[in-house]
């Protein structure tokens, strides 16, 4: 019975996340650095430059609604289909289930897809697939299979009936086995994408809808920034409130 208990513990109490040396939890933080008087740009420009660098990796492609011809609805991918071609930046129909399914399959075969769900509200259309076929794949196979797809979306605007939701509690509790990254600005988002792409776990990045045209200083080391996952960022420390 002791041997069976040890075996079952290994079978059913391990591998929710990657346990390899490539786990994104091992990523070291590389902070943004700036010139004394940095150039201020729209947040979307920071992501555009970052995605252009990611796409130079032959394994990386971006798939989703309006990501190609119009450069996505917030212009973070503007011009990238022209540079890299429609196989690297691919427009799809309005079929979230198909988008996610293609991404999961590609990631299981060694590619590194970044699939876009245009708004966070729409993540519930493919939710059964995300929950049953993606988030728990590593756990169900005791680490034998991986699907390190990155699901990119945006939300939190909280300013209207549509395209404004922030159902994070449902997602965090419903998609065990996935890293959830919620950046406060697009520089931090770029670092989170880089950390996830360097690792071998699945991840969701929820960008802030109101951040694409807010001005941010352009880092001098934008293409090197990494965010350490699971470690809170301290913006201002105090005696009563931090």
Language-model region placement:
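Short, acidic loop-beta-alpha module within alpha/beta folds
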Residues: 236-242
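Short, flexible, solvent-exposed loop/turn segments with mixed acidic/basic and small polar residues
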Residues: 169-170, 232-234
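Thiamine diphosphate
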Residues: 2-211
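Aromatic-enriched
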Residues: 211-233
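A short acidic-Thr-Gly-centered motif at the start of a beta-strand
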Residues: 53-54, 234-236
């Amino acid at each position: 019975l002791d041997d069976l208990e040890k075996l079952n513990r290994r079978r059913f109490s391990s591998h929710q996340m990657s346990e390899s040396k490539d786990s994104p939890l091992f990523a070291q933080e590389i902070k943004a650095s700036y010139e004394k008087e940095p150039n201020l740009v729209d947040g979307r420009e920071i992501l555009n430059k970052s995605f252009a660098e990611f796409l130079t990796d032959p394994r990386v492609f971006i798939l989703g609604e309006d990501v190609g011809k119009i450069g996505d609805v917030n212009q973070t991918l503007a011009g990238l289909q022209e540079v890299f071609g429609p196989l690297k930046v691919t427009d799809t129909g309005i079929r979230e289930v198909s988008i996610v399914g293609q991404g999961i399959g590609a990631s299981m075969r060694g590619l590194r897809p970044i699939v876009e769900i245009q708004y966070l509200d729409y993540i519930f259309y493919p939710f059964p697939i995300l929950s049953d076929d993606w988030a728990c794949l590593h756990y169900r196979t005791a680490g034998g299979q991986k699907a390190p797809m990155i699901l990119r979306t945006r939300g939190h605007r909280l300013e209207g009936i549509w395209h404004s939701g922030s159902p994070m509690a449902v997602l965090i509790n419903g998609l065990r086995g996935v890293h959830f990254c919620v950046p406060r600005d697009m520089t931090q988002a770029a670092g989170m994408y880089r950390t996830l792409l360097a690792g071998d776990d699945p991840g969701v990045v929820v960008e802030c809808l109101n951040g694409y045209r807010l001005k941010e200083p352009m880092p001098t080391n934008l293409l090197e920034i990494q965010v350490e996952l699971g470690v809170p960022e301290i913006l201002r420390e105090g005696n009563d409130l931090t």
